[in-house]
């Protein structure tokens, strides 16, 4: 039993509040245990240079953390006059993950900007940002679709993420901060609702891990993501039937120009 009384294969309580921000085209507050992230989606007609004239859209992301989202105050990136390496890595991950669930031709020549602002951090902020980012992206696309700006709904797959790791020799799902800080192995998994992997980030922080342990972590993560996607579907209700109405364009989904 873990410090918060969860089983090793149990995700933290998850709550997603849809349309959390009044002005954004899509938004949500996602809570995974004590981790809380506000995510917004903004539609912009100015696509990156490599997409101009292509008729295709793009998804990009930004990630930041409030100074007191953590136990000790962190300096804002803007006050350091540069984006921290951690924030840069995370926002690239979020963008890549969400692009795997969109058809850029159906989106049209526009960009959706996903802003992830962590207001309270207790581990798993990047995975929560991806899971919440999908909801915000979905609602931004729905606005375009409902207003008949686009003909086809461009979201092709559900996308969600979770962390897994090895603590005290035990494979665990959805690590909180204390578990993450002492984990011998730390891994982040991103998958879609077809059971396909989008990204695997894994590091032996304290000790190497075996192939058998790796397989156990993948299976734990797969089970966790399936449960998280079930929550996403509950939040979207009947709207989730729109997902997958157009197929994925594999050629454009694999671009990583950022």
Swiss-Prot record:
Coiled coil: none annotated. Pfam families: RNase_PH, RNase_PH_C. Keywords: Nucleotidyltransferase, RNA-binding, rRNA processing, Transferase, tRNA processing, tRNA-binding. GO terms for biological process: rRNA catabolic process; rRNA processing; tRNA processing. GO terms for molecular function: 3'-5'-RNA exonuclease activity; tRNA binding; tRNA nucleotidyltransferase activity. Its EC number is 2.7.7.56. It is an enzyme of class 2 (transferase). It catalyses: tRNA(n+1) + phosphate = tRNA(n) + a ribonucleoside 5'-diphosphate. Phosphate binds at residues 86, 124-126. It comes from the Bacteria. The keyword Disulfide bond does not apply. Gene3D superfamilies: GHMP Kinase, N-terminal domain (3.30.230.70). InterPro entries: ExoRNase_PH_dom1 (IPR001247), ExoRNase_PH_dom2 (IPR015847), ExoRNase_PH_dom2_sf (IPR036345), PNPase/RNase_PH_dom_sf (IPR027408), Ribosomal_Su5_D2-typ_SF (IPR020568), RNase_PH (IPR050080), RNase_PH_bac-type (IPR002381), RNase_PH_CS (IPR018336). CDD domains: RNase_PH_bact. The keyword Translocase does not apply. PANTHER family: EXOSOME COMPLEX COMPONENT, EXOSOME COMPLEX COMPONENT RRP41. Homohexameric ring arranged as a trimer of dimers. Phosphorolytic 3'-5' exoribonuclease that plays an important role in tRNA 3'-end maturation. Removes nucleotide residues following the 3'-CCA terminus of tRNAs; can also add nucleotides to the ends of RNA molecules by using nucleoside diphosphates as substrates, but this may not be physiologically important. Probably plays a role in initiation of 16S rRNA degradation (leading to ribosome degradation) during starvation. HAMAP family: RNase_PH (MF_00564). Belongs to the RNase PH family. This is Ribonuclease PH. It comes from Caldicellulosiruptor bescii (strain ATCC BAA-1888 / DSM 6725 / KCTC 15123 / Z-1320) (Anaerocellum thermophilum). The lineage of its organism: Bacteria, Bacillati, Bacillota, Bacillota incertae sedis, Caldicellulosiruptorales. The gene is rph.
């Amino acid at each position: 039993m873990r410090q918060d009384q969860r089983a090793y294969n149990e995700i933290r309580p998850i709550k997603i509040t849809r349309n959390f921000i009044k002005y954004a085209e899509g938004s949500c507050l996602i809570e995974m245990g004590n981790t809380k992230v506000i995510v917004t989606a903004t539609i912009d007609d100015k696509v990156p240079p490599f997409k101009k004239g292509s008729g295709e859209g793009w998804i990009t992301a930004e990630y930041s953390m409030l100074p007191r989202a953590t136990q000790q105050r962190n300096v804002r990136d803007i006050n350091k006059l540069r984006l921290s390496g951690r924030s840069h890595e995370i926002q690239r991950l979020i963008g890549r993950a969400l692009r795997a669930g969109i058809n850029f031709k159906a989106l049209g020549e526009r960009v959706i900007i996903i802003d992830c602002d962590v207001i309270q951090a207790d581990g798993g902020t990047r995975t929560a940002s991806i899971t919440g980012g999908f909801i915000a992206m979905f609602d931004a696309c729905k606005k375009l679709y409902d207003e008949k700006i686009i003909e086809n709904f461009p979201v092709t797959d559900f996308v969600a993420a979770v962390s897994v790791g090895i603590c005290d020799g035990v494979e665990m799902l959805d690590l909180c901060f204390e578990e993450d800080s002492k984990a011998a192995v730390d891994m982040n998994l991103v998958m879609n609702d077809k059971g396909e992997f989008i990204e695997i980030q894994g590091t032996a922080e304290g000790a190497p891990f075996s192939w058998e342990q790796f397989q156990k972590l993948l299976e734990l993560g797969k089970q966790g993501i399936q449960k998280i996607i079930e929550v996403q579907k509950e939040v979207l209700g009947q709207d989730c039937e729109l997902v997958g109405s157009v197929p994925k364009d594999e050629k454009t989904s694999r671009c990583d120009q950022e």
